[in-house]
Protein backbone atom coordinates (compact mmCIF):
# COMPACT_ATOMS: atom_id res chain seq x y z
CA UNK A 1 0.00 0.00 0.00
CA UNK A 2 1.28 3.46 -0.91
CA UNK A 3 0.34 6.66 0.93
CA UNK A 4 1.03 10.34 0.52
CA UNK A 5 1.79 10.73 4.23
CA UNK A 6 2.27 8.52 7.27
CA UNK A 7 1.76 9.99 10.72
CA UNK A 8 3.77 7.98 13.24
CA UNK A 9 2.15 8.39 16.64
CA UNK A 10 -1.59 9.03 16.57
CA UNK A 11 -1.88 10.68 19.97
CA UNK A 12 -2.25 14.35 20.84
CA UNK A 13 -0.66 16.01 17.80
CA UNK A 14 -0.64 13.01 15.49
CA UNK A 15 -4.39 12.48 15.60
CA UNK A 16 -4.97 16.06 14.45
CA UNK A 17 -2.19 15.84 11.86
CA UNK A 18 -3.99 12.83 10.42
CA UNK A 19 -7.26 14.72 10.41
CA UNK A 20 -5.86 17.77 8.63
CA UNK A 21 -3.90 15.66 6.14
CA UNK A 22 -7.02 13.71 5.21
CA UNK A 23 -8.99 16.95 5.04
CA UNK A 24 -6.46 18.23 2.48
CA UNK A 25 -7.17 15.17 0.36
CA UNK A 26 -3.91 13.38 1.13
CA UNK A 27 -3.89 9.60 1.27
CA UNK A 28 -3.09 9.24 4.95
CA UNK A 29 -2.02 6.45 7.29
CA UNK A 30 -1.90 6.92 11.07
CA UNK A 31 0.46 4.45 12.74
CA UNK A 32 0.54 3.70 16.46
CA UNK A 33 1.79 0.72 18.42
CA UNK A 34 -1.35 0.83 20.55
CA UNK A 35 -5.00 1.27 19.68
CA UNK A 36 -5.67 4.95 20.32
CA UNK A 37 -6.85 6.37 22.59
CA UNK A 38 -4.77 4.36 25.06
CA UNK A 39 -3.03 4.71 28.42
CA UNK A 40 0.57 4.16 27.33
CA UNK A 41 1.46 7.73 26.37
CA UNK A 42 1.09 11.31 27.57
CA UNK A 43 -2.52 12.34 26.98
CA UNK A 44 -4.72 9.95 28.97
CA UNK A 45 -6.35 10.80 32.28
CA UNK A 46 -9.40 12.61 30.86
CA UNK A 47 -8.25 16.24 30.81
CA UNK A 48 -5.52 18.70 29.86
CA UNK A 49 -5.35 22.42 30.68
CA UNK A 50 -5.84 25.06 28.00
CA UNK A 51 -4.43 28.55 28.63
CA UNK A 52 -3.18 31.45 26.53
CA UNK A 53 -1.53 33.70 29.14
CA UNK A 54 1.58 31.58 29.14
CA UNK A 55 4.11 31.64 31.95
CA UNK A 56 6.56 29.69 29.79
CA UNK A 57 7.00 32.62 27.43
CA UNK A 58 5.19 34.77 24.89
CA UNK A 59 6.66 32.91 21.92
CA UNK A 60 3.90 30.34 22.45
CA UNK A 61 0.98 32.76 22.43
CA UNK A 62 0.39 33.08 18.65
CA UNK A 63 0.27 29.27 18.48
CA UNK A 64 -2.18 29.19 21.39
CA UNK A 65 -4.43 31.81 19.87
CA UNK A 66 -4.61 29.76 16.69
CA UNK A 67 -5.24 26.62 18.75
CA UNK A 68 -8.13 28.32 20.54
CA UNK A 69 -9.76 29.01 17.18
CA UNK A 70 -9.07 25.52 15.82
CA UNK A 71 -10.47 23.78 18.91
CA UNK A 72 -13.69 25.73 18.46
CA UNK A 73 -13.87 24.99 14.74
CA UNK A 74 -13.28 21.28 15.30
CA UNK A 75 -15.96 21.12 18.00
CA UNK A 76 -18.43 22.79 15.66
CA UNK A 77 -17.53 20.60 12.66
CA UNK A 78 -17.81 17.39 14.67
CA UNK A 79 -20.76 18.54 16.79
CA UNK A 80 -19.03 17.51 20.02
CA UNK A 81 -18.01 19.26 23.23
CA UNK A 82 -14.29 18.93 23.90
CA UNK A 83 -13.40 22.23 25.56
CA UNK A 84 -14.69 23.34 28.98
CA UNK A 85 -14.30 27.12 29.00
CA UNK A 86 -14.46 27.35 32.79
CA UNK A 87 -11.45 29.65 33.10
CA UNK A 88 -7.85 29.07 34.16
CA UNK A 89 -6.70 30.48 37.49
CA UNK A 90 -2.95 31.15 37.77
CA UNK A 91 -1.90 31.58 41.42
CA UNK A 92 1.51 32.69 42.65
CA UNK A 93 3.71 35.45 43.99
CA UNK A 94 6.10 37.76 42.16
CA UNK A 95 7.74 34.93 40.22
CA UNK A 96 8.97 34.95 36.62
CA UNK A 97 6.09 32.66 35.70
CA UNK A 98 3.45 34.99 37.15
CA UNK A 99 5.10 38.07 35.65
CA UNK A 100 5.03 36.33 32.26
CA UNK A 101 1.33 35.63 32.75
CA UNK A 102 0.65 39.29 33.56
CA UNK A 103 2.75 40.40 30.60
CA UNK A 104 0.83 38.06 28.30
CA UNK A 105 -2.49 39.49 29.47
CA UNK A 106 -1.31 43.05 28.89
CA UNK A 107 0.55 42.60 25.61
CA UNK A 108 -2.10 40.44 23.94
CA UNK A 109 -5.16 42.10 25.49
CA UNK A 110 -6.38 38.83 26.98
CA UNK A 111 -9.54 38.73 29.07
CA UNK A 112 -8.50 38.24 32.69
CA UNK A 113 -9.29 39.21 36.27
CA UNK A 114 -6.75 39.84 39.04
CA UNK A 115 -7.56 38.56 42.55
CA UNK A 116 -5.71 39.09 45.83
CA UNK A 117 -5.23 36.42 48.49
CA UNK A 118 -8.40 37.39 50.34
CA UNK A 119 -10.47 37.22 47.16
CA UNK A 120 -9.02 33.80 46.32
CA UNK A 121 -10.25 32.50 49.66
CA UNK A 122 -13.63 34.21 49.48
CA UNK A 123 -14.38 33.25 45.89
CA UNK A 124 -12.71 29.84 45.57
CA UNK A 125 -11.81 28.66 49.10
CA UNK A 126 -8.12 28.58 48.19
CA UNK A 127 -5.81 29.50 51.07
CA UNK A 128 -2.53 31.21 50.19
CA UNK A 129 -0.21 33.71 51.88
CA UNK A 130 -0.86 37.44 51.53
CA UNK A 131 1.91 37.91 48.94
CA UNK A 132 0.12 35.57 46.52
CA UNK A 133 -2.37 36.71 43.89
CA UNK A 134 -4.42 35.13 41.15
CA UNK A 135 -4.88 35.81 37.45
CA UNK A 136 -8.13 34.30 36.23
CA UNK A 137 -7.96 33.95 32.46
CA UNK A 138 -11.48 34.05 31.06
CA UNK A 139 -12.76 31.66 28.35
CA UNK A 140 -9.90 29.20 28.78
CA UNK A 141 -10.06 26.09 30.98
CA UNK A 142 -9.46 22.50 29.96
CA UNK A 143 -9.89 20.02 27.12
CA UNK A 144 -11.15 16.44 27.34
CA UNK A 145 -7.95 14.81 26.09
CA UNK A 146 -8.86 11.17 25.50
CA UNK A 147 -12.11 12.14 23.81
CA UNK A 148 -10.27 14.69 21.65
CA UNK A 149 -7.79 12.12 20.34
CA UNK A 150 -10.57 9.64 19.64
CA UNK A 151 -12.63 12.31 17.87
CA UNK A 152 -9.74 13.48 15.68
CA UNK A 153 -8.92 9.92 14.61
CA UNK A 154 -12.56 9.17 13.85
CA UNK A 155 -12.82 12.39 11.84
CA UNK A 156 -9.68 11.49 9.89
CA UNK A 157 -11.03 8.03 9.10
CA UNK A 158 -14.33 9.47 7.88
CA UNK A 159 -12.26 11.52 5.44
CA UNK A 160 -10.51 8.39 4.16
CA UNK A 161 -7.49 8.01 6.43
CA UNK A 162 -6.38 4.53 7.43
CA UNK A 163 -5.09 3.45 10.84
CA UNK A 164 -2.40 0.88 11.47
CA UNK A 165 -2.05 -0.47 15.00
CA UNK A 166 1.32 -2.21 14.97
CA UNK A 167 4.95 -1.86 16.06
CA UNK A 168 7.36 -0.38 13.53
CA UNK A 169 10.46 -2.52 13.10
CA UNK A 170 12.19 -0.82 10.15
CA UNK A 171 12.07 2.43 8.16
CA UNK A 172 14.24 2.70 5.07
CA UNK A 173 14.45 5.03 2.10
CA UNK A 174 14.81 4.03 -1.54
CA UNK A 175 14.68 6.42 -4.49
CA UNK A 176 13.11 9.14 -2.39
CA UNK A 177 10.32 6.90 -1.07
CA UNK A 178 10.09 5.77 2.55
CA UNK A 179 9.28 2.15 3.32
CA UNK A 180 7.82 1.44 6.74
CA UNK A 181 7.93 -2.16 7.90
CA UNK A 182 5.82 -3.15 10.89
CA UNK A 183 5.58 -6.55 12.52
CA UNK A 184 2.66 -7.52 10.32
CA UNK A 185 2.65 -5.28 7.25
CA UNK A 186 4.58 -2.94 5.00
CA UNK A 187 3.68 0.40 3.42
CA UNK A 188 5.37 2.98 1.20
CA UNK A 189 4.97 6.70 1.81
CA UNK A 190 6.11 9.92 0.21
CA UNK A 191 6.27 11.83 3.48
CA UNK A 192 6.49 11.04 7.20
CA UNK A 193 5.41 13.11 10.18
CA UNK A 194 6.75 11.81 13.50
CA UNK A 195 4.82 12.81 16.60
CA UNK A 196 5.47 9.77 18.75
CA UNK A 197 5.79 11.44 22.15
CA UNK A 198 7.86 9.41 24.60
CA UNK A 199 8.26 6.67 21.97
CA UNK A 200 10.22 8.85 19.59
CA UNK A 201 13.61 7.33 20.37
CA UNK A 202 12.25 3.88 19.54
CA UNK A 203 10.96 5.14 16.21
CA UNK A 204 14.17 6.95 15.27
CA UNK A 205 16.26 3.92 16.24
CA UNK A 206 14.72 1.83 13.43
CA UNK A 207 15.38 4.43 10.71
CA UNK A 208 18.03 2.97 8.41
CA UNK A 209 19.29 6.27 7.01
CA UNK A 210 21.19 9.18 8.46
CA UNK A 211 19.25 11.56 10.69
CA UNK A 212 20.37 14.26 13.12
CA UNK A 213 20.39 13.39 16.80
CA UNK A 214 17.19 14.43 18.60
CA UNK A 215 17.60 15.04 22.36
CA UNK A 216 14.27 13.90 23.84
CA UNK A 217 14.08 12.40 27.31
CA UNK A 218 11.22 10.81 29.24
CA UNK A 219 9.76 11.63 32.64
CA UNK A 220 7.31 9.45 34.54
CA UNK A 221 4.48 11.67 35.80
CA UNK A 222 1.62 11.02 38.21
CA UNK A 223 -1.65 12.75 38.98
CA UNK A 224 -3.92 12.29 42.00
CA UNK A 225 -7.66 12.67 42.49
CA UNK A 226 -9.19 13.79 45.79
CA UNK A 227 -12.78 13.52 47.01
CA UNK A 228 -14.45 16.84 47.73
CA UNK A 229 -17.82 18.49 48.18
CA UNK A 230 -16.36 21.73 46.83
CA UNK A 231 -14.18 22.81 43.89
CA UNK A 232 -16.70 21.51 41.38
CA UNK A 233 -17.12 22.40 37.71
CA UNK A 234 -20.86 22.74 38.29
CA UNK A 235 -20.11 25.37 40.96
CA UNK A 236 -18.00 27.45 38.57
CA UNK A 237 -14.60 26.32 39.85
CA UNK A 238 -11.86 26.81 37.22
CA UNK A 239 -8.82 24.81 36.22
CA UNK A 240 -5.75 26.11 38.03
CA UNK A 241 -1.98 26.43 38.27
CA UNK A 242 -0.60 27.09 41.76
CA UNK A 243 2.97 28.13 42.52
CA UNK A 244 4.57 25.95 45.20
CA UNK A 245 8.19 26.49 46.29
CA UNK A 246 10.19 26.10 43.04
CA UNK A 247 7.43 24.07 41.42
CA UNK A 248 3.75 24.25 40.47
CA UNK A 249 0.63 22.28 41.16
CA UNK A 250 -1.90 22.15 38.35
CA UNK A 251 -5.40 20.82 38.48
CA UNK A 252 -8.96 20.51 37.30
CA UNK A 253 -12.36 21.06 38.88
CA UNK A 254 -14.31 18.05 40.05
CA UNK A 255 -16.80 16.95 37.41
CA UNK A 256 -16.89 13.20 38.11
CA UNK A 257 -14.08 11.60 40.12
CA UNK A 258 -12.88 14.43 42.37
CA UNK A 259 -10.38 17.27 42.14
CA UNK A 260 -7.53 16.16 39.86
CA UNK A 261 -4.07 17.49 40.76
CA UNK A 262 -0.61 17.08 39.26
CA UNK A 263 2.79 18.56 40.04
CA UNK A 264 4.97 19.96 37.29
CA UNK A 265 8.61 19.24 38.10
CA UNK A 266 8.51 15.99 40.04
CA UNK A 267 8.73 12.55 38.48
CA UNK A 268 11.39 10.00 37.66
CA UNK A 269 13.57 10.46 34.57
CA UNK A 270 13.51 7.15 32.71
CA UNK A 271 15.25 5.82 29.61
CA UNK A 272 12.68 3.42 28.18
CA UNK A 273 8.93 3.01 28.38
CA UNK A 274 9.39 -0.29 30.21
CA UNK A 275 10.69 1.71 33.18
CA UNK A 276 7.33 3.44 33.55
CA UNK A 277 6.03 1.39 36.47
CA UNK A 278 2.41 1.48 37.56
CA UNK A 279 0.95 4.08 39.89
CA UNK A 280 1.67 3.29 43.52
CA UNK A 281 5.04 1.71 42.84
CA UNK A 282 6.69 4.57 44.73
CA UNK A 283 5.62 6.11 48.03
CA UNK A 284 5.97 9.58 46.52
CA UNK A 285 3.23 8.79 43.98
CA UNK A 286 0.77 10.04 46.59
CA UNK A 287 3.05 12.01 48.93
CA UNK A 288 4.47 14.47 46.36
CA UNK A 289 0.99 15.91 45.90
CA UNK A 290 -1.13 14.81 48.84
CA UNK A 291 1.35 15.92 51.50
CA UNK A 292 0.97 19.58 50.51
CA UNK A 293 -2.14 20.25 48.43
CA UNK A 294 -4.59 20.31 51.35
CA UNK A 295 -2.76 23.33 52.76
CA UNK A 296 -4.17 25.32 49.85
CA UNK A 297 -7.48 23.49 49.34
CA UNK A 298 -8.91 22.97 52.85
CA UNK A 299 -12.13 21.31 51.64
CA UNK A 300 -10.33 18.38 50.06
CA UNK A 301 -11.09 15.00 51.57
CA UNK A 302 -9.30 11.70 51.04
CA UNK A 303 -7.13 10.63 48.12
CA UNK A 304 -9.33 8.55 45.82
CA UNK A 305 -7.16 7.36 42.93
CA UNK A 306 -4.05 8.04 40.87
CA UNK A 307 -2.70 7.59 37.38
CA UNK A 308 0.69 7.59 35.68
CA UNK A 309 1.82 8.73 32.23
CA UNK A 310 5.06 9.60 30.44
CA UNK A 311 6.09 13.08 29.30
CA UNK A 312 8.63 13.64 26.49
CA UNK A 313 11.13 16.33 27.47
CA UNK A 314 13.56 18.46 25.51
CA UNK A 315 16.69 19.75 27.31
CA UNK A 316 15.27 23.28 27.59
CA UNK A 317 11.58 22.27 27.96
CA UNK A 318 10.69 23.98 24.67
CA UNK A 319 9.25 22.11 21.70
CA UNK A 320 11.39 20.61 18.95
CA UNK A 321 9.76 21.25 15.55
CA UNK A 322 11.92 20.66 12.49
CA UNK A 323 12.69 18.70 9.35
CA UNK A 324 14.95 15.71 10.00
CA UNK A 325 15.04 14.80 6.33
CA UNK A 326 13.63 16.40 3.19
CA UNK A 327 10.25 14.71 3.61
CA UNK A 328 10.43 13.66 7.24
CA UNK A 329 9.09 16.18 9.75
CA UNK A 330 9.49 15.88 13.51
CA UNK A 331 7.57 17.32 16.45
CA UNK A 332 8.77 16.30 19.90
CA UNK A 333 9.56 17.31 23.44
CA UNK A 334 5.92 18.32 23.70
CA UNK A 335 5.54 17.85 27.46
CA UNK A 336 3.13 20.79 27.67
CA UNK A 337 1.83 20.35 24.16
CA UNK A 338 -1.70 18.95 24.29
CA UNK A 339 -3.38 22.34 24.22
CA UNK A 340 -1.50 23.04 20.96
CA UNK A 341 -2.56 19.76 19.31
CA UNK A 342 -4.66 21.06 16.39
CA UNK A 343 -2.23 23.90 15.66
CA UNK A 344 0.83 21.65 15.66
CA UNK A 345 -0.92 18.93 13.68
CA UNK A 346 -1.88 21.42 10.98
CA UNK A 347 1.55 23.07 11.10
CA UNK A 348 3.33 19.76 10.50
CA UNK A 349 1.21 18.77 7.53
CA UNK A 350 1.53 22.22 5.95
CA UNK A 351 5.31 22.19 6.46
CA UNK A 352 5.62 18.92 4.57
CA UNK A 353 3.35 20.08 1.75
CA UNK A 354 5.06 23.44 1.27
CA UNK A 355 8.57 22.39 2.34
CA UNK A 356 8.63 25.59 4.38
CA UNK A 357 8.64 26.44 8.06
CA UNK A 358 7.56 29.76 9.54
CA UNK A 359 10.56 31.90 10.59
CA UNK A 360 9.27 32.16 14.17
CA UNK A 361 9.10 28.36 14.44
CA UNK A 362 12.66 28.12 13.14
CA UNK A 363 13.79 30.79 15.58
CA UNK A 364 12.38 29.22 18.73
CA UNK A 365 11.89 25.51 18.10
CA UNK A 366 14.49 24.37 15.56
CA UNK A 367 16.70 21.42 16.36
CA UNK A 368 19.68 23.60 15.44
CA UNK A 369 19.55 25.35 18.82
CA UNK A 370 21.17 22.29 20.37
CA UNK A 371 24.10 22.08 17.95
CA UNK A 372 26.43 24.08 20.20
CA UNK A 373 25.42 22.15 23.32
Residue ranges with predicted function:
Residues 13, 19-23, 81-83, 198-326:
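Active-site substrate-recognition segment that forms the wall
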Residues 170-187:
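Conserved beta-strand-loop-beta-strand element in the redox core of flavoprotein oxidoreductases
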Residues 295-373:
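C-terminal catalytic lobe of FAD-dependent flavoproteins
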Amino acid sequence: MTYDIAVIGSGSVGSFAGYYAAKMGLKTCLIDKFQAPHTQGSYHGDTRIFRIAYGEGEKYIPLLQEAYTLWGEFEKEQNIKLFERCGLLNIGSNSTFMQNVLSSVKNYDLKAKILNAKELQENYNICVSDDFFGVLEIDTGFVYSDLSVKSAINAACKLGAHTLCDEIVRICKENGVYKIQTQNSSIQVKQILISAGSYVNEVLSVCEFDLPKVPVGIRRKVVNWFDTDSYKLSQGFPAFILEFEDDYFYGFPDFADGLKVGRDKVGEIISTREERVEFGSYEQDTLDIGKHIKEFFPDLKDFSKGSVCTYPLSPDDDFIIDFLDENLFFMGGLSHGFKFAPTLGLLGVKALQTQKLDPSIKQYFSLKRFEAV
